[in-house]
Amino acid sequence: MTTETKEQKKKMIIEHLTWDDSVNADNIKVTIEDGTAELWGSVQNYTAKMAAERDAYQVEGVRKVKNHLDIQFPPTMSLPGDGEIEAHLEKLINWNRELHAGHIHVECDQNVVTLSGTAESFWEKHVILHLANATNGVIEVNDQLRVKPPRVLNDEIIANDIREAFRRNYLIDEHQINVEVHHGSVHLRGTVPGFLVKIEANTIATYTSGVTDVVDDMTIAQ
């Protein structure tokens, strides 16, 4: 990628971030190298942080995004205290009937939440982390959760289940993605045609029985 092309891509990403009404792009710096865009600076909440990453992926030629954005709430915003955040998040987790929340511990210190304990599936862990990140007043989540499925499945069974789900999905060409599983941890590699396929493959792996972790090393084709 030439210097001129890099500057064009950078300009397009910044324009797309500025266009997105859910993102305050005033404090975002963008760098791009070899198709990898990096986002630096701060945004106003977790939703904006995830939206900024999605926006960068939508620009043609961006193959990977590294999201280094911090969350800085507006100075005029009234934030809940650590105890309020803990109590609110514990209620959210305990009231969700899909979650086996008996072994989850929540601690908050200076708006940084630490989650510890065990979840019965990786998708449950994924939901819990999303709830924590989206909670008002939380600037960071320290993930110490472990996944301990009630029934341990053979790695090859897990890998085959994921591959079969890929075959059934009209967005995914299963030949483009290499699936490796080691002690329940799924590693996805390969080059896919777009961001939607990347998200879809991650979602399938996340919701597959027996999975304890998902590592995404997929890149997007130029």
Label the model's feature ranges.
Residues 1-222:
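N-terminal targeting leaders
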